Structure formats: C-alpha cells, structure tokens
C-alpha cells in the first residue's frame, strides 16, 4: 500500500495556495468549499487543523488576499504589527529591545539560544503566563506579552550567564571586540559578574585556510554558522560535531573551507569564533575605521559593500545590505579580493613623467589640467575596462572623446552587450533581482559558469533549488 502523504506545514500550505491562485487569477477565500482541491492531495488531511488557525471565523487571506494588521499588547502598550511575522521580528521593527542570537533575517528561527524569551498571557485575567521564545511565536491579534517583567528578564539573564560559563574573557584581544553581538546582548540583559568558579571547557582550534581564523572557545552554540554554511550556502565540509556541552563547529579534518561563500561566516557569527584572518597582522578596531558605501567591481552583479580604511590602507570589506542586489551576503572574491589596492606598486598620487624619466608629483587640480591639455591635442586614446564602474568609463570617454575611446573588450563582446541591452529595453525580458531568483519556479542557464562569472547569483540559485525542495 502506498505511504500516506506527509501532513503539510502551515507555511507550505500558504506557498502552494498562493502559487495556485496566482496561476488561476483567483482572489476568493482559499478555505471555501472546493477551494483546496487544486492543491496537493495531502492537503485534505490538513484542512481541519488549518481552520483552527483562523480566529473567530475571520480569514486573514480573504478580501483579495489583503490581511489586516494584528494588534498585540506588550507590557501594557498596544501595537499594530505586520501579519505573518514572529514576535521577535515585530519587536525589532517597533524598536523594542529583545535580545537574540540564533535568529537571522535571512535564515529564520530555530529557537536554539533561548535568549528571546518573553512571557505570554492567555488573556487579561491571566496573572502567571508562560515563557515562550519570541522567534518561535507568531503574532496574533489580541496576544498579550511581557518583555520587561521580572520573570522574562530573570530567564534571559540566566541564559546569558550559562552561555558565559565557558566563554573566555578575552574581549580586549578578540577581533570581534567593539562589534560583538554577544557583548551587546550581555549588556542589554544586565549580566555583569560570573558566579561560577569551576574549570571551563576548552577546545582545540582548527586551521580553516588563509582567510578565516577559528577560535572555538568563544562559541555560544547558536548554530548560525552551520545553518548558513550547509543549509543556505550548500557547503558540506563544516558541521556540528559531538553533543551536549562538547558541541564543536568545524571540519572533520583541518583544511581550507571549500565554499566560495565561506567568508560570510565572519559576519554571520555573533561572537568571535570566525574572524577575518587578514586583520591579524594589522588589526584595527571598528571605531578606528573610516568607512563609506561602495560597490564591488568583481563582477557585473554590483554587490553593495562597506570598505573600511585606516592610515590610507584598505583594512577590510563588509557586506552592505541591499535587498534587490546582494541581501546580507557577499562572495569571497568580493570580500577578500580587494587587497591589491594596498600594493606598493600601485600609484598613490597623480604625477607627470618627464623626458628624463623623473616622475614629478602633481596635486589633483594640476593633474586634471594636464590631462585636459593632453586630450585636447588628439594624441591620447582612452581604454575603458568592464571591471571599472560605468561612471568611470563614461568620464574617461568624455575626456578623450568618442573617437579616441575603446570600451576595453572585443567586438564580439560589444555585439553581445548591444544585443542584451536591446532585449532589455525593447522586449518583455526583465533583469530579475536576488529575491526574484530565489523564489523562481524554474531557471534556465545557457552555457555559463555562474559561480565564476557572478557568484552572488549562484548563491541565489541555490536558494531557489532549496526553497522548491521544501515545498
């Protein structure tokens, strides 16, 4: 006898229902008689359970798919929040301080750290309440919570105290100091003194390559690293080993991490377990860096970055969130591949080469005047680069003139670029953003190694395959 189909989860029902009604152009209630027939056969076992999620017979997906904003009560105050969110996300959007570790906006919640604990009350007469995890509790209309109560605060303080039992007090020498999420959350809950005087558990660190440093003794077991590396990025050589108080996050054997996106562990980790090894010899604290928004020129995606500089040298490159381009992550090429700008052979100031070979320094105003003089003679040609920004290529073309400018790639590539531009402007073809790629039903790739030509797109393709596997 064939096995019974698995009982679908609520999120799977929502996705499948949405897909069906988008194709059918249907906007009436999905709970109406016969409305769920187009869905998978296993959904019939879920109908009764799903109806229990509807409060008072009101369907939040009726009225053409529009849902009302639920009202919740937190510490006596009423708030209107976005439907479909959990309590932690709602609190963060409202500007309320609720500590957390394991939750990440790109990876969701697993309730591993127990740090976002709050007290939920059944109704206004309930005086005891029960402790629930904010990241695992969906917001519902009329729900009552307490963040600032003694019960919730005491629970969160005990969790931080247990996390700090084996944590080393090496903040002054930790590369994460000054931007450590654990530091911020520890201060937020008010934990100050260690009562435990026993011996701490210690771990042996691993060599993970020339780019990432490993310090396992700082781990708080939030599982962010393996959830990102294995589930999100598709890596296979980093895992959670052992169990209980001896959980170890690393490789079975020492070696270089194989994923092209391993560098994101530096930002995903809320403590200093994974840090940027390129800062070891010339370490700089975050508050000493001069940072400015920039764009990665490693490929055509144009990921948003935040490079940090000190003493005229680039120290590091961090991700800068942009939902339509790169989201929360960069590829390793974009994160670690900009070190060439610190080369001693790179020109650090403008100058003019004399006939006798001398190189005389000029200020920027003098250099621009000299360039204008040389370009006006008609004897200077400009060669652009696909690695440079569009603005830089345009300024070079403007300076030397259209007849003396070459784009920096072959005629065949020029034809392809022209054809692609024509298709984009004069056809129904669109350039999808990261979110569109991640939610695509089907993707066709023609003769291209996406991982090498556009790594961030390759990471989005992994999400598309992963999301479809969960449906």
What role is predicted for each listed range?
Residues 19-68, 327:
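Intrinsic disorder at enzyme termini
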Residues 44-46, 52-65, 114-297, 301-305, ...:
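Fe-S ferredoxin-like electron-transfer domains
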Residues 4-21:
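Short, small-residue-biased leader/transition segments that mark boundaries at the very start
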Residues 164, 168, 215, 222, ...:
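Catalytic alpha/large subunits of respiratory electron-transfer oxidoreductases
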């Amino acid at each position: 006898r064939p096995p019974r189909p698995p009982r679908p989860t609520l999120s799977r029902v929502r996705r499948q229902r949405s897909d069906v009604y988008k194709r059918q152009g249907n906007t009436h209630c999905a709970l109406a008689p016969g409305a769920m027939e187009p869905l998978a056969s296993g959904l019939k076992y879920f109908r009764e359970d799903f109806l229990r999620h509807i409060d008072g017979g009101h369907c939040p997906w009726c009225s053409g798919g529009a849902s009302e904003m639920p009202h919740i009560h937190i510490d006596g105050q009423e708030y209107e929040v976005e439907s479909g969110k959990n309590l932690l996300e709602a609190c963060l959007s409202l500007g309320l301080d609720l500590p957390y570790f394991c939750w990440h906006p790109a990876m969701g919640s697993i309730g591993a750290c127990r740090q976002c604990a709050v007290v939920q009350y059944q109704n206004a007469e309930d005086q005891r309440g029960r402790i629930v995890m904010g990241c695992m509790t969906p917001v519902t209309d009329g729900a009552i919570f307490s963040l600032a109560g003694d019960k919730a605060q005491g629970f969160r303080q005990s969790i931080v105290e247990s996390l700090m039992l084996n944590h080393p007090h090496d903040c002054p020498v930790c590369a994460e100091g000054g931007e450590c999420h654990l530091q911020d959350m520890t201060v937020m809950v008010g934990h100050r003194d260690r009562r435990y005087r026993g011996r701490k558990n210690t771990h042996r660190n691993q060599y993970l390559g020339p780019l990432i440093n490993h310090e396992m003794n700082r781990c708080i077991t939030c599982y962010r690293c393996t959830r990102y590396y294995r589930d999100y990025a598709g890596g296979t050589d980093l895992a959670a080993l052992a169990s209980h108080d001896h959980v170890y996050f690393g490789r079975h054997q020492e070696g270089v991490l194989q994923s092209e996106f391993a560098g994101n562990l530096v930002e995903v980790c809320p403590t200093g377990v994974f840090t940027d090894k390129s800062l070891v010899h010339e370490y700089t604290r975050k508050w000493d860096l001069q940072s400015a928004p920039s764009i990665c020129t490693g490929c055509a995606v144009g990921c948003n970055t935040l490079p940090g500089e000190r003493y005229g040298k680039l120290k590091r490159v961090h991700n800068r969130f942009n939902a339509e381009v790169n989201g929360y992550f960069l590829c390793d090429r974009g994160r670690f591949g900009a070190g060439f700008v610190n080369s001693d052979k790179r020109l650090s100031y403008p100058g003019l080469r004399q006939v006798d070979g001398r190189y005389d320094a000029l200020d920027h105003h003098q250099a621009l005047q000299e360039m204008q003089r040389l370009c006006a003679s008609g004897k200077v040609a400009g060669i652009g680069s696909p690695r440079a920004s569009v603005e830089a290529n345009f300024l070079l073309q403007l300076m030397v003139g259209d007849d003396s400018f070459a784009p920096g790639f072959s005629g065949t590539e020029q034809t392809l670029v022209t054809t692609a531009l024509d298709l984009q402007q004069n056809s129904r073809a669109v350039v999808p953003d990261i979110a569109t790629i991640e939610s695509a039903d089907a993707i066709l790739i023609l003769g291209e190694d996406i991982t090498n030509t556009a790594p961030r797109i390759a990471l989005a393709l992994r999400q598309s395959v992963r999301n479809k596997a969960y449906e």
